[in-house]
Regions:
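Conserved short alpha-helical segments that host acidic/polar catalytic motifs at enzyme active sites
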Residues: 1-309
């Protein structure tokens, strides 16, 4: 459980003081979903800046320059990777064609280790599941709707991604985790957070009383929304991954039945597990990779049938 937050001041109506007040209020409110680390990404002076530390957001007192109009942020609740290492905090930096981008993720990815093997991704000291999304984008050598769609359809688990590219386009890739986005058309401002309660709390705490009567911009699971630095929106979609079907019941005969624990012998059981995995679109190599990573046969079987390890 982490939190995404940020804003787009596309009409440049906020003063420097107002921007920083809003940023800090959102970041502090986002601590509700994580205090292990916090970070932000933004452009200034013609380059991407990422500030992140393994500390709660309120301690960091984020500050951005007046020229910055788009900022994305993240508070971390560590689930994978050393919580004390700043390089495991979000946002992460990537690079495509000499241009840097930033990515943050709320959720848990279950197949990052499989993707490292199957996609031949480079080794990294970063220990989080989220970083695989950066590597997948870099491998495609493109950052656009098509490349984001492919990543969203490759990963397994829960997610909302925010991605800031070199042109100050902010992408929202909406999986099955929460996201709340407000638009203030009169002021020319978008503000977002992972939940409505956090967003409302951050706005109230900012003291920016002129931010009233927002229009909620709805996004659903399977949506990819891009907002450019001028406030223009474009929406595309990805296929919602169907890797995790309902657990088997007698009423659903087309899903293969779980193997009985009472009749297992180790070799035969692993062979059966490989056969069952093929019904879900996974190769023998995928199962052997999970086994080599230390997952037990029971854990892999749970993953296949219920999406849980």
């Amino acid at each position: 459980m982490c939190c995404l937050f940020g804003f787009i001041d596309y009409n440049h109506n906020l003063s420097g003081k107002q921007k920083n007040r809003l940023l800090r209020s959102l970041a502090s409110a986002a601590e509700e979903r994580g205090t292990d680390a916090a970070g932000i990404a933004y452009h200034a002076g013609g380059r991407l800046h990422i500030m992140k530390k393994a500390k709660p957001a309120h301690v960091l007192r984020f500050r951005i320059p007046l020229e910055t109009s788009v900022v994305m942020g993240h508070t971390r609740y560590a689930t994978q990777g050393d919580a004390k290492k700043a390089y495991n905090a979000h946002p992460f930096q990537g690079q495509i064609g000499g241009k840097k981008f930033a990515l943050a993720h709320n959720g848990v990815l279950l197949n990052d280790r499989i993707l490292h093997k199957t996609e031949n991704l480079p080794k990294t000291h970063i220990g989080t599941d989220s970083y695989v999304a950066v590597q997948l984008l870099e491998k495609q050598n493109a950052l656009n709707f098509n490349s984001l769609r492919k990543v969203a359809e490759q990963v397994q688990g829960t997610f909302v991604f925010t991605v800031l590219d070199a042109q100050d386009n902010l992408y929202f890739v909406h999986g099955d985790n929460p996201l709340c986005l407000y638009h203030f058309p009169k002021q020319g401002i978008y503000v977002y957070a992972s939940t409505q309660s956090i967003l409302e709390h951050g706005l109230t705490a900012s003291g920016l009383s002129f931010l009233k009567k927002p229009v909620e911009v709805k996004t659903d699971e399977g949506d990819i929304l891009r907002i450019d630095r001028h406030g223009e929106r474009k929406l595309q979609h990805f296929c919602i991954n169907s890797f995790c079907p309902p657990c088997y019941s007698d009423a659903i005969e087309w899903y293969p039945k779980p193997l009985s624990a009472g009749r297992r012998n180790p070799d035969a059981y692993w062979e059966g597990l490989v056969s069952v995995a093929a019904s879900f679109g996974y190769t023998p190599k995928d199962i052997h990779t999970l086994r080599e990573c230390g997952f037990t046969s029971d854990e892999i079987e749970d993953f296949l049938y219920c999406g849980e390890i």
